[in-house]
Amino acid sequence: RPARIWLLWVPAIAVTVGVLVAAAIYSHGVAATRGWTLGQRLLSEPRVLFDYLCQLWLPRPLSPGLFNDGYVVSTDWMHPWTTLPAIAGLFGLGLVAWHWRNRQPALSLAIGFYLVGQSIESGPLPLELYFEHRNYLPAALMFWPLALWLTNPDTALPSVRAVTSIGLPLLLAGMTWLGASVWGNASGQAMIWGERNPNSPRAQAYLAQWELNQGRVRAAEARLRTALRSHPTEVQLVANLIDVRCRQGFLDKADLAAAVHSFSTNPDPTRLSFRWLQGALPMAEVHTCGGFGLPEAGQLAHAFADNPSTPVAPGRRSDAMHLLGEVALASGNAHEALADFNAAWASEQRIDTVLVQAAMLASAGLPRLALDHLQLASTPIVRPWYRWRSMTDVHRWVLHRQGFWQQQIDELRGKITSDLVHSP
């Protein structure tokens, strides 16, 4: 019995405590970045689990796909009304597994394994609410009781067992073929997922991108405007709308104002805002899109920086200041660009970002400012092992131990100094 305690209960308790500690750490500020609170997530997940179970026991040839950001959040016990029944049903499944553990061990194991397997990704960690792939491992034992019944010659209903043994694999094979035909067809994915997920901004943006690439510019514009009426703060929708309007040749002030509103109020300022704006800067510099030049790009960058959720989301404040620095540099405001780049470092000490920014300053003909900025990276900040929060911290520690960053800093400093010495 002592061995059982050490081999079973101690690891189980350690894992449980670890998950709860991680949940406490990562749930800080979750409402500002996810759009729901941790309590709302815990209320919603029982409904999600029953949706997963329906996919397993009532399979459909076509799934909602990858775009699940339109899933309705449970705001309390009764909204939606399925919240309380789902919670009660989840407790009921646990009681069934416990009650039948001696008489039906396979059934109890299948239920228990599924619930435990879902307890992390569908539990207190503030992940996205819904993803189909979370069903894979927890469902590994789901159909073991059915297989035992089908292969047991002593059970009743032999004709039903025979028909099920032949018909069920054929049915599942047919639905698998139908599903694979969609997953192997990008245009089919865009159309089907867009139609099946009308409340998903991701699905609508994905379908609009496909329509734009097919030359259906007006259809893409209409789709994005319809989606924006329900989701006015979604950056992916306004960013794609700007792309559509620029394809048409001009961005009017009303659409720019809608974009500024979205960038400044989006509760989940993901890296999408940074990547899209950074990709749009070359277009703004050469002014190939009427109504969208560097001043307009600067408005969006300032809106991103002024968003109240930006300082809360890890890394986004640094991204915002980097964008402002890029806009200032492209506009010829060298010292303003340096101040913004320095502010990005103050927000998050990332040596790779400093190297990129110093290279940008040097490429713009500002080697002295580049050397001044590079000096910030002379004392890299590396978290001690007991403060590691993610693999990113581990990776930074490894690179620091290997002297990688110092080598990169010395190499870039040498190139900039050489250019400065040989410049006229």
Outline where the language-model segments fall:
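C-terminal luminal/periplasmic domains and tails of membrane-associated envelope-modifying transferases
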Residues: 79, 191-424
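Polytopic membrane enzymes that build or remodel cell-surface glycoconjugates and lipids
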Residues: 1-245, 249-251, 260-269, 291
